[in-house]
């Protein structure tokens, strides 16, 4: 009995008219389009993310960034590592160049500062040296001039005494001569401080025959 009952049900279902199928299809709701489903899903995701962000902000909890899943491709990993190394080396090179430029500028600035200080010290030393030389020259000139004045005064005193002595001992010489046929008559009178002196002499002249 039990085995015969499902057969009768299946037979009855098979013998249903096709009109019932059309009615059932018309009564079912139409399926939504895929674009509408995507738009609705995006809106739901946005709303969910906004709600989560607002909740995090209110609660003060900072969400940690999700870690990216590891890449299984070794070639991509090598390229990424090479590119990161290139970027790091480039940044280090730029930093080293900036440091080198700053150090070069500071060395030039320090050299100029030292040069200006050395020049100022040299000028100060030359001024002091020149002032000392001028003072020494003035002192030497004053000493030499004083010595010269002393010698000049001594010479004037000696000359005055000598002139006085020569004036007291000064004499005059006067005389006359007379020439005859064979003689030269000479008579001199010398006046000295002590007294007059008269010299007379006859000089014979040689006569050729």
Swiss-Prot record:
Key words of the record: Cytoplasmic vesicle, Repeat
GO MF terms held by the record: calmodulin binding
Record-linked SMART domains: IQ
Disulfide bonds listed in the record: none
Any GO CC annotation of this UniProt entry: acrosomal vesicle
InterPro entries: IQ_motif_EF-hand-BS, IQCF, P-loop_NTPase
GO biological process: positive regulation of acrosome reaction; positive regulation of flagellated sperm motility involved in capacitation
Principal location class: cytoplasm
Pfam families xrefs: IQ
Gene3D superfamilies associated with the record: 1.20.5.190
Stretches assigned to the IQ domain: 72-101, 128-157
Ranges for region Disordered: 1-73
Places the protein is found: Cytoplasmic vesicle, Secretory vesicle, Acrosome
Biased composition (Basic and acidic residues): 1-19
Superkingdom, natural source: Eukaryota
Subunit structure: Interacts with calmodulin.
PANTHER family associated with the record: IQ DOMAIN-CONTAINING PROTEIN F1, IQ MOTIF CONTAINING F
Function: Involved in sperm capacitation and acrosome reaction.
Name of the protein described by the UniProt record: IQ domain-containing protein F1
Organism: Bos taurus
Protein's gene: IQCF1
């Amino acid at each position: 009995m039990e085995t015969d009952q499902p057969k009768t049900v299946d037979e009855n279902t098979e013998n249903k008219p096709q009109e019932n199928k059309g009615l059932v299809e018309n009564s079912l709701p139409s399926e939504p389009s895929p674009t509408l489903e995507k738009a609705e899903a995006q809106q739901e995701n946005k709303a969910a993310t906004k709600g989560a962000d607002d909740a995090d902000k209110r609660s003060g909890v900072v969400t940690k960034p999700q870690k990216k899943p590891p890449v299984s491709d070794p070639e991509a990993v090598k390229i990424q590592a090479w590119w990161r190394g290139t970027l790091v080396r480039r940044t280090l090179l730029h930093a080293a160049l900036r440091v080198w430029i700053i150090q070069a500028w500071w060395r030039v600035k320090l050299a100029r500062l030292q040069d200006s200080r050395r020049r100022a010290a040299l000028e100060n030393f030359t001024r002091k040296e020149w002032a000392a030389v001028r003072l020494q020259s003035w002192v030497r000139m004053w000493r030499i001039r004083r010595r010269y004045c002393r010698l000049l005064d001594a010479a004037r005193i000696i000359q005055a005494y000598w002139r006085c002595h020569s004036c007291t001992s000064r004499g005059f010489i006067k005389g006359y001569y007379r020439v005859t046929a064979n003689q030269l008559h000479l008579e001199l009178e010398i006046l000295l401080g002590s007294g007059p002196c008269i010299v007379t002499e006859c000089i014979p002249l040689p006569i050729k025959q």
